[in-house]
C-alpha cells in the first residue's frame, strides 16, 4: 500500500502481484504417507492469510489492502493459501458484505474467526495484549501470534473420543485391536448407573490423554535433535536473541492444542445410553452391547439401531439434554490436557503448555476406519463427525440450532480452535434478502453466542453427487474440508461423501 500511495505501482499492479503469489503458493506440495493422506485429504499445505481484525484500541483494522487481498483470492479461486477473516462487532459493513459475496463463489473461503472470543482467551493464557490483538490464523482454524510462535501450534496425535468411550465400556480393552489400552475401570454390562459409565470415561480419557502426551513429547525431542529448522528459527522472535532454535524454546510464545475426533458421536452416544438404557430402560445394557458388537446386523439389532438414531436427542439441535452431556464429558479431557507442559516449558517461551482444539482435518475418516460401531447408531468403520460439527444427518433444526449447540462448548478453554463447518446451497443465497439473513446469522453467532469459528461449503448436493460419479467433469470443483479448501478430485473416495 505504501508503493501505491507513493505512485510506484497501481492498485491493479498490486492485485496482479498478489494473484501471482497465490498461484506460486499453490505449486508447493509434499509426498505424504497413506495414513497422513487420510488425515489430510486434498493435499493441504496449511498456508493461511488473515485479514480484518481490530487494533488494540478496538478500532476496525480493515483497510484498502484487506479489499485487495479479498479480491485477489476471489479472482484466483485456488485452494491455497487459506483465507481467514477476523470478525469483530465493529467490522466494516461494506467489507463484511464483500466477504459474503466471495463465500457465494463456492470455494469455501473466507473462513471467519471471532476476535471477541479469541483475543480474551489469548490474554488469559499470558499473551501480551498487543500481541493478542495481532493474532492470525495458522493451518486450518488454529490461531497464533505471527513471527513469535513455537514451531507447531497443534497436536501430532488424535484422541478418538468414540473409541475411547468404547474402551471405557470394555474394561480398558480396545474393541478394534483387542489390545489393552488402559488399566480398565469395569465393563458396561456391570455399570449400574450412568454415573458409573461417566466415571469410567473420565479415568479412561485422562489415561489416554497422558499416553498421547508421552508420544508427542518423544516426537518433539527427536525433531529438536534431528530437524532444527534453522531458517524458520532465524525468522522467529526471539530465537536469535536467546541463541536457541524454535524447537529448543527460542520463540516468544509456545502453546500446543490437543486434537480430538468424534465429539458429536461421543455426545450422541452418551445421550443414547443415558436415555434409553438408564432412564427409560427401553434397551438393556446387554442388548446394546451385543448390538454394537454385531454392528447392528441382525433384525433385532437393526431395530435397536433405529431407536439409537431416532429416539434420542442429538448434538446440533440446541437440546440441553445432549449438549450438557458433551460439556461434562469434554471437561475431563480439557482438565487433563492442561496438566502436561510441552518440551519447551521453562526453556524460554511464555506458555509451554497445552489447551484444547477441535481441528480434526479429515482424520474423522481415517479414525472412523479404525472404530467399530458406536452407541449413537453409527455403523462400524464409517467416518466420525469432524471438528465440533454435528454427526452426519443428526442436525434437524437448522443452522441456528447448530450455532447454539456449538456455543455451549467451553470455548474459552479451547483456544486451539472450535472448528465448525456449515453447508448451504447456492440457491439459498440467490437473493439479497437471503444474503443479509446469512450475515445476521453469523453476527448473532459471534456477537451474542460467542462462537469461535465458522466456514461454509456453498455448493449444491447435485453437484457433489455428480462429482462423485464423474470426477473428470469437475476438476475445478473446490469444496471445504475441516479448515481448508481442496479440489474435489484430490479427495479419497471416503472423504467426499462426508461432505455430502
Question: Can you say where each PLM-predicted feature lies in the sequence?
Answer:
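Conserved catalytic cores of very large enzyme subunits
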Residues: 1-494, 500
